[in-house]
């Protein structure tokens, strides 16, 4: 099947097509090209667009017809997860090891499955230096065993990836971030593509048109100051 796809011209452009122009097959594919500059990535996320492509492909930009999202105030950890965390030696931090989280999200996936290639890693680390990319870390004593990272767009957190090296680590990262995010007036966590794992954690489906409306509203509003200041979100290591 031949697909006609427009290209970002010039490659450093921050002007994207309207997301309603995305293809139906493959679902959500909008445009190709670009350079993953910080300005380009920030503009993309502000318009509900994210990069996702495989090694050897051009940069592909997506906005699927249905998003996976969390409303953090509705996130409810199971009793078993609460009990597990209470009895564990885990502790949870925010923005204490963002580079490590990005690296581990890439390296812990099978090579043929990962889209987090070296140029993506470098791009999101640059966004971290600019204060846009943030991470949640789960530790067992001094070992980093799980976490997630994503971008701050107003009152939305755009989740990029998560990893887990020990039982429940990524679930606990998400739970503790939801608690924190709500307390600082965060409203929505965008998971991009829905999948069974996210659904099992409580993610909801949202149509692209509804997401676009909510994005236009929430991207211009701010969380409470110091939301992303490096800090401890939960600590059982001394209990």
From Swiss-Prot:
Instruction: Give the CC-aspect GO terms.
Output: cytoplasm
Compartment(s): Cytoplasm
Top-level taxon of origin:
Bacteria
What Enzyme Commission number(s) appear in the record?
Answer: 2.3.2.6
Recall the GO molecular function terms of this protein's record: leucyl-tRNA--protein transferase activity
Q: Which InterPro entries match?
A: Acyl_CoA_acyltransferase, Leu/Phe-tRNA_Trfase, Leu/Phe-tRNA_Trfase_C, Leu/Phe-tRNA_Trfase_N
Keyword list, A-Z: Acyltransferase, Cytoplasm, Transferase
Q: Catalytic activity annotated for this protein? A: N-terminal L-lysyl-[protein] + L-leucyl-tRNA(Leu) = N-terminal L-leucyl-L-lysyl-[protein] + tRNA(Leu) + H(+); N-terminal L-arginyl-[protein] + L-leucyl-tRNA(Leu) = N-terminal L-leucyl-L-arginyl-[protein] + tRNA(Leu) + H(+); L-phenylalanyl-tRNA(Phe) + an N-terminal L-alpha-aminoacyl-[protein] = an N-terminal L-phenylalanyl-L-alpha-aminoacyl-[protein] + tRNA(Phe)
Q: What is its main location?
A: cytoplasm
Q: Name one GO biological process term.
A: protein catabolic process
Which Pfam family name is an example for this entry?
Leu_Phe_trans
Hey, which family's this protein in?
A: Belongs to the L/F-transferase family.
What this chain does, per the record?
Functions in the N-end rule pathway of protein degradation where it conjugates Leu, Phe and, less efficiently, Met from aminoacyl-tRNAs to the N-termini of proteins containing an N-terminal arginine or lysine.
Classification via PANTHER family: LEUCYL/PHENYLALANYL-TRNA--PROTEIN TRANSFERASE (PTHR30098), LEUCYL_PHENYLALANYL-TRNA--PROTEIN TRANSFERASE (PTHR30098:SF2)
**Protein name per UniProt:** Leucyl/phenylalanyl-tRNA--protein transferase
Say which species the protein is native to: Aliivibrio fischeri (strain ATCC 700601 / ES114)
């Amino acid at each position: 099947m031949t697909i006609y796809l427009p290209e970002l011209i010039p490659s450093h452009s921050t002007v994207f097509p309207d997301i309603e122009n995305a293809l139906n097959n493959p679902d959500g594919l909008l445009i190709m090209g670009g350079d993953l500059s910080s300005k380009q990535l920030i503009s993309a996320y502000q318009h509900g667009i994210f990069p996702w492509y495989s090694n050897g492909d051009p940069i592909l930009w997506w906005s699927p017809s249905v998003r996976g999202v969390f409303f953090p105030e509705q996130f409810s950890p199971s009793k078993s997860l609460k009990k597990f965390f209470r009895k564990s030696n885990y502790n949870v931090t925010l923005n204490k090891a963002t580079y490590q989280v990005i690296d581990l999200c890439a390296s812990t996936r099978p090579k043929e499955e990962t889209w987090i290639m070296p140029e993506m890693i470098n791009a999101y680390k640059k966004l971290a230096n600019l204060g846009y990319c943030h991470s949640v870390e789960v530790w067992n004593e001094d070992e980093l065993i799980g976490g997630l990272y994503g971008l701050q767009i107003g009152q939305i957190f755009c989740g990029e990836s998560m990893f887990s090296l020990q039982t429940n680590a990524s679930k606990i990262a998400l739970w503790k971030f939801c608690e924190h995010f709500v307390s600082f007036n965060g409203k929505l966590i965008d998971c991009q593509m829905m999948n069974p794992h996210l659904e099992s954690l409580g993610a909801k489906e949202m149509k692209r048109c509804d997401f676009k409306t909510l994005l236009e509203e929430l991207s211009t509003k701010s969380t409470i100051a110091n939301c992303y200041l490096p800090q401890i979100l939960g600590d059982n290591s001394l209990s």
